[in-house]
């Protein structure tokens, strides 16, 4: 006796032979190549189902992890006109998804017998000549390899293509890169066919229903408004040819009058109810209220069937309060990234060996690649990531204690990181010119070898040089940078109507004002140029606003360098009296009659001198001079 655990109802017939779904079953009807081609070429939804995932999988391509000269040689081979690997892989993936399979033929210079296996170890520099993409219908497959000890198990024993003069040529499976569309899991059902199904096979009904719904809704548009005319004795007119001619002439004339005078001419009394007589005219309109939701449902089903989010498939904005679509796109890109690892990388393994040997003449074991991220970061997110990497490296280098890693090794790793992610354009060329951190000559401590002028003596640019602290005793700290192009800045201020301004020598930007005592030596150093200067480029967001309770009027501006430097000192123990840090230059403490809302902010570049470390002067305001 067989017992089935299922829900049944003898009253409604659910789960019994009376169930309306009892006779339903699945059947498989393969789509032919002609219909698949017609769908891809003639239906926008089917075309997107085929093209979107290959386009996203190959859009950012991959990053080789090797020395820069090696990377340049490898990429030169990949981008050669007859190879163009990224484009060829994209095309092969589309063909495989459309027809169920495709191959990329690997053309090697000097090959005589294509039926012989391709040994990547025999490839020399420049031996890779070209790559050709062929669909499953352009090649004939030999018997499927059934030997489980063979590396080509489950693949054709050979591929046959048309050669010169149409003569068939057999190609060993090691000489092609094989792509399969939707894999057939039960190989017994396909016999000797080594290919998969088209991805359109499983989504056919969903795509067709979405297209049909769109077409039917479009067909309703001409019927949105229909004129209905009631005519007494209409049947009598249609009995004879003369009557039908009179009927046609009657309504032709009525329609002409409607077009000329925007009026409907009818024969009748115009009365209502019992008094009604003669012809009657009315309009019927079709309601489209629920049709957009219905069409959207069909399109959403098609998107789900294709495993592509609607925001990507339909190029539409996400719906819902505070919806951004980021989660949908992240899931989509995660899917593409997973496919890169499970579909592309294994398929390209042998070809990659050929590319490396053709580019370098050998196969260094340390070289590998990583798929480039598909999710792009905004400029703000990139800056935040850059800061986190820099802060992490500073922590590993021992900002507050001993280093956790060898500093030179950490520097080399950081240079490679910033080069690969493009955070610092031109870094690689600069390293080649100036050398790495390990290449720099060791310098003795400035505190031990630099003679300091006595207190009160003037240093460069006539500025009093402060005595350096020769110990690491914690003390309050004030760090600033002088504005070098102060005269240009003050010229702008005078043009804007400021009668009194700070002197050029007093113009500066504050980086740190720590009332808490800190170890000055733990503050690190700035990332400016060799001369210690920092230039904030012209333009960008700038405002002239009052600041604080002292009547100061300042120019607010943005500088990632200053912000990161400030945060680095905060993390090293410096205090700050305000909720956040905003770089600014004080213009004046006496605004006078100037209407700040009418002031045009200074747009030129700001050039600041080296950082100045000094103790906090609580009487700093008494030393300010305005002119």
From Swiss-Prot:
> Which keywords annotate this record?
Hydrolase
Quote the record's binding site residues for 3',3'-cGAMP.
105, 614, 620
Q: Which domain of life is it from?
A: Bacteria
Show the active-site residues.
508, 510, 584, 586
Which InterPro entries does this UniProt record tie to the protein?
A: Acb1-like_C, Acb1-like_N, Phage-assoc_HI1409
Alphabetized Pfam families for the sequence:
Acb1, Phage_portal_3
Q: Does the keyword Methyltransferase apply?
A: no
User: Which residues does the record give as 3',3'-cUAMP binding sites?
Assistant: 105, 614, 620
Task: Please give the catalytic activity noted in the UniProt record.
Answer: 3',3'-cUAMP + H2O = U[3'-5']pAp[3'] + H(+); 3',3',3'-c-tri-AMP + H2O = A[3'-5']pA[3'-5']pAp[3'] + H(+); 3',3',3'-cAAG + H2O = G[3'-5']pA[3'-5']pAp[3'] + H(+); 3',3',3'-cAAG + H2O = A[3'-5']pG[3'-5']pAp[3'] + H(+)
Q: Where is this region: Disordered?
A: 437-474
**GO MF term set:** hydrolase activity
Query: Would you identify the family this protein belongs to, as annotated?
Result: Belongs to the anti-CBASS protein Acb1 family.
Q: Describe the task this protein carries out.
A: Counteracts or regulates the endogenous CBASS antiviral defense system. Phosphodiesterase that enables metal-independent hydrolysis of the host cyclic di- and trinucleotide CBASS signals such as 3'3'-cGAMP, 3'3'cUA, and 3'3'3'-cAAA.
The extra comment attached to this record reads: This homolog of an antiviral immune evasion nuclease may be due to cryptic prophages, or it may play a role in regulating the endogenous antiviral defense system based on cyclic nucleotides.
NCBIfam families, per database record: phge_rel_HI1409 (TIGR01555)
Q: What is this protein called?
A: Anti-CBASS protein Acb1
Q: What is the lineage of its organism?
A: Bacteria, Pseudomonadati, Pseudomonadota, Alphaproteobacteria, Caulobacterales
